[in-house]
Each structure stands twice: as structure tokens, then as C-alpha cells.
Amino acid sequence: MSIPFSNTHYRIPQGFGNLLEGLTREILREQPDNIPAFAAAYFENLLEKREKTNFDPAEWGAKIDDRFYNNHAFKVPSGATESKEAPPEKSEPEKETPQEVVKEQETQVSFVEEVSTDDEEAAAAAVKIQAAFRGHKARKEVKIMKESSIEEQ
């Protein structure tokens, strides 16, 4: 609701947008005939899940939005990860054995090696870019030559 010629903006509570996005997504997915009844059932189901798992998706979404808009990545060391911001279903176990750590380091190294094998693709892309620029430059020169020949006549 807005008031004409007013600088007043109402603030949406944190997490409310995430709740509405989730409801909208489910409505579009299910295409129900009675949307208000579907919304009531959706929110009841969401409340039951929140009571059982002690996980509030609205609160989690608000934290994610806050992190997106107030990026504090430069304050956190590069190797540190925060498990508080991951949903409980997808969070990793807290205890890791040294073997798992070694496997993670091996996968990171192999990923870096994969990136370096794309040199041929990068060279092909560079050739395409250079050819496009040369064509553009040639068309520009032809246009200038045509304009100068028209002016001379």
C-alpha cells in the first residue's frame, strides 16, 4: 500500500519474501484449482516440518539474503566455512577423518588440472574473436572509403 506523494516505504519482514517465493513455486508446480486452500495446506505443512526438524526456511532464507546483500566474505578466512548457513538436510557431518580431507584435496587438484586442459578451446575462441574484430575493422575501412569516394564526386 502506498500513499501518493509520500516518501514512506514499508519494510517487508525478513524471511517473508522467501515464504512467498516458496508458496508461489509450489502453486506454479501443482496448478491447484483452489489457491487459498492450497496455500493454507502448504503453510500448515511448513509449520509441521519446522516443528519436527527445528529448521525454519524463512529464517535460513533471511540469513542467505543478508549474506548476499551484506557480503562479508572478505572478513571470513578463505578456508573457513560456516555450517550455520546450510540447511540441515544438506549440511556435511561435523567430524571428518583425515582420509576424507585427503580425498577433498585430491579432487581440488584434479579440478585445477581440468581447467588447464581447456587451452585449445581458449585458443579457438581467441581466433574467433580476432577474426570478428578484423572483419569489423575491414567493414569500417570500406565504409570510410565509400564515403570519401562519394564526397569526391
From Swiss-Prot:
- How does the record classify its membrane topology? Peripheral membrane protein
Instruction: Return the GO cellular component terms, semicolon-separated.
Output: membrane
Q: Please describe the organ and tissue distribution of this protein's expression.
A: Testis- and sperm-specific.
Biased composition (Basic and acidic residues) is annotated at 82-106
The alphabetized UniProt keywords are:
Membrane
Is Acetylation included in the keywords of this UniProt record?
Answer: no
Q: Which Gene3D superfamilies match?
A: 1.20.5.190, cAMP-dependent protein kinase regulatory subunit, dimerization-anchoring domain (1.20.890.10)
- Compartment(s) where it occurs, according to its Swiss-Prot or TrEMBL record: Membrane
| PANTHER family in the record | IGLOO, ISOFORM A, NEUROMODULIN
Tell me the subunit arrangement: Homodimer. May interact with ROPN1.
Q: What is this protein called?
A: Sperm surface protein Sp17
High-level lineage? Eukaryota, Metazoa, Chordata, Craniata, Vertebrata
